[in-house]
Amino acid sequence: MTKAILFSAVILGLIFFLSSCKTYYIPVDSFKQQFAGMDTSQLKEVTTRGPMGDKVKYKTFPINFIKCVDKNGNPVELKNSPSLEIRFTDTNNKKTIFYFDLISVDETYVSGVQSRFITSIKKKIPLNAIKTIEIQDGKKKFSYVE
């Protein structure tokens, strides 16, 4: 019986490992450059469909691909999607996660929404307090629709 439990645990671990989200990194200077010169006058309206089939319209920055690097430092262009999650770690090692297409960036702050269901609650992080930026596809069933 213990062999069956061990075998099941190994299989579950392997499934989790193979299906886990791949994390990429955005150097802070690169992040600032990718948003440089953008302001709210450039926002475009998009419509997303959620896992329950619901549709939501909102405005987002017109970024189609995000320049980032993999764990080995190789450059990668990640296609923007509503399921992308961006994780900021500040100088105190506090982590904040936003949906990438629901962030806004100005000269001093990154603002974002942490939930697609309660979009009225926003949070701000000072740009100069950001130590690392990670981005990954959370594999949540959100997609852009025309």
Predicted regions and their residues:
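Bacterial N-terminal signal peptides that target proteins for export
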Residues: 1-9
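Compositionally biased alpha-helical segments
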Residues: 22-146
